[in-house]
Amino acid sequence: PEEAIEAYNKALTLKPDYAEAYNNMGIVLQDQGKPEEAIEAYNKALTLKPDYAEAWNNIVFPLRSIKSKISLSEELTSYYPKDTGSNNYEIYRATLNYIMNLGAAQAENTLDEALKALGNSENIVIKNPDYDSRNIGSKMPLTDKVVALVHWGRSGTGLLHSLIDDHPEVSTLPSIYLSEHFNHSNWERMISDGWSQMADRFMAMYDVIFDAKSKAPVHSKSLILLYNIGLKEGMANVGDQRDEVLKVDKKLFCAELQRLMSFYDQLDALLFFKLVHRAYDKAISDIHQKSLIFYHIHNPNAHAQLNFVRLAPEANWVMMVREPVQSCESWLRKNFEKNDYTGVATRIITMLFEIDTIIYHKQKSVGVRLEDLKESPRRTVPALCNWMGIKDNESLYEMTAQGKKWWGDPSSPDHAQDGMNPFGKTSINRKIGSIFSESDQYILQTLFYPFSLRFGYVEENAEQFEIDLQVIRPMMDEMFDFEKTIAEQTQVDPEQFMKSGSYLYLRSGLIERWNILKEFGTYPNMIRPLKIN
């Protein structure tokens, strides 16, 4: 690490305006457990390159690492990047402030500020240079109903999506390809070549929709590029014999999308999104009249999620949930096996904050228990249909993708040689303990208690909860047993391990969640469970 810092300093001596070097230096400093210095490096990168999305994303980690230690007289915002004249500065800053205040008392205010900043942005619509108002009579009505599906840990979003897939009233694209469609930078790329090239640009950005074997990447959370995502999600071995590849005819899709676009004088990301679904249905010969778009937004970054909320304020949200500690252990299993401590820490914090998201509290939203879907599908599915405003249908009890039999996510620990049983109970019956010791579980179960109570995973015991909160606070200052295992596997001295950036990030987030529970006794913005008669 020290050699890396020295190398970046040399590079900056030769090229003082090298923003990427400052960004990379920030990553190293954060890993070393020097969050203040990392923040300084990211700020320098953003002074040189104000729209540097990666640096805006990276600065969240050191800010989170110091947040729990900042005194009441000090404002976290003093560490934020300063405005250097960027057109998108207010968007980036407001989004950052929203992220840093998830679950806080001022969460609603920061949400409103972020939505306002996004709404004031330039280039949020693109105009049709060849618009002919005489075409208006040919325009077909588009559905206003959109249901967005988000995950929480490993909780079965792929399963639910596959059950919804072939419903005659629902339009949905396969997999999670479009999870970052509403990210401002993605939309800017979409319209960068002008109106006439948008259909081609979409097909290039999402080539995997048209051939599940495509190796072309799609953008995911935190600017990560996902390669071979169609293969990894099992979209290239569908059908009764597992020998079919999901494909869409590009010529048919492009022609239909361009035809639909011609009826509009301008488009924003949401309207274009709806036209894409209409063109997709036409290209796969789905002739059913659709009343709803089911959007597997999955695990979007804050920017994409906020922009979707701004454009589709009436959209409904569904979160798949599962017993929290079991869900968490399953989700971070691969990170743990690779000794990827940063990934483990990030996923634990993500789950603890996502249960307290103001968006789900304000919007029409429900949480669907994986356990209910597995154990009582004939009660749970109709209840969800009623909530979504669609009819129950036999297609809802089979796993499909583009109407073809889907055999499940190959990365799932429950993906057997003969595929997955949609209502098999292996996942929900799996015992906890492969990663988390009893001590680890006790801390996490206490922090997840309000959510577990709301969703019926535990019986209410407020007095014991108060006791548990007090007991776990000093325990959180020590290493978890799973952390000791990673330190041993990676041959890192425990004292040095506790100085790492990921350790500080995890501890600061845990303490922040503990403080909220101590103050309010619950998480104020939790999603509500689906009511099942």
Predicted feature descriptions by range:
Residues L246-Y397, K405-P422, R528-I532:
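PAPS-dependent sulfotransferase catalytic domain
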Residues Y18, Y52, D83-N88:
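Residue-level recognition of tetratricopeptide repeat
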Residues Y8-N9, E20-D31, E54-F61, I91:
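Conserved alpha-helical positions within TPR/SEL1-like repeat arrays
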Residues G103-P141, V146-V147, I390-N533:
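PAPS-dependent sulfotransferases, especially Golgi type II membrane carbohydrate sulfotransferases
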Residues I176-H296:
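PAPS-dependent sulfation machinery
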